[in-house]
Amino acid sequence: MDSNTIRIFSFCGGGTKGYGSNRFMKKFIQQWGIPQADLWKYADVMCGTSIGAILASGYSFGKTQDEMESFFTTYAKRIFTIRTATDIATGSHNASQDSYRPDLLSKLAIIATNDSFYRSAYEDSNYGHNILQQVLVSNFGNSTLANFKTPVVIPAYEEDMKRYVVFSNFNDPAYFIGNNESIVNVCRASSAAPVYLPAHNFNGHYYSDGGQYANDAILAAINIGLTVKPNANRIVIVDVGTGIGNMSFDGSGTETGLEHTAVRLFGIMNIAMTGSEEWSRYYLDYLSNRLALDVYFYKFQPKFPVDFANEIDNSTTAWFTQLSNLIDTHYTNESDKIASILTHLTA
């Protein structure tokens, strides 16, 4: 790559809707004409939050979009499922059904106990966060951030210290931590969505989802890009969102005041997470169109129809098929913009 251009790829959080982000990248890479496993060779910096952290880690580690797709189509249904009443009554440690999600009242009951929806009940349980841990280990083993092939930025929240942190393999301890931390731990930290998955504990600290404050880590990625390529005069950014919609309780079937309150609170969380993405979009759009800087920016961010199930723990085959169709339609509708950013990437 030339030394005059900084190329950045950002992947936002959104749970299983990250399947759409990976599908976008699969189509984008195919249109670009480069091997799937070689994306890192064409990126100066990658960043990601929550599921975006897992995608950015995979791509920077040399994983293909086909490989990352199995995270959703094969394993999500076991991460986002719980034990049935029969499973519990019979004393089973395991969940007998795929994609068996708690309903709204059950979720409220779990929240009331300060627990997470998809916490595995036992260390040997075949569902929940145990499966997330197993899948990450099978993909990254004991590798650390230092094994990434390109600089990566991953935000998380350090709960016990009430501190916002940014993990990176870029060595600048004044601004980043975890250069030699395991990829598994960092991905678990950034993807521990409150109430959905338990906070992840390592090195004496508890971490939860970076999407609580930085669902799009693009600004930190730009800073690293400017540092590793101080003489660059062009910045090209591909920022991949998981779509705009209701990321949590949809409010259907609510009857009590408590239920309506829960819907409202989770709606606010949705606004906060999506809002951080849209604020980054606003900043970068202004930067590229109004200031005398050579910045080229594309945001892939489909707007989902009101009848689409947008909660971040959907995982059925039918749902992934529906999401795939929506992504394909948006990709087609954005063909001119996508062709334009590819021109700048390859210039």
Model-derived regions, located:
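Patatin-like phospholipase
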Residues: 2-12, 16-136, 176, 184-187, ...
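Active-site gating loop/helix substructures
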Residues: 115, 133, 146-230
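Hydrophobic residues at beta-strand termini and immediately following loops
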Residues: 11, 167, 208, 300-303
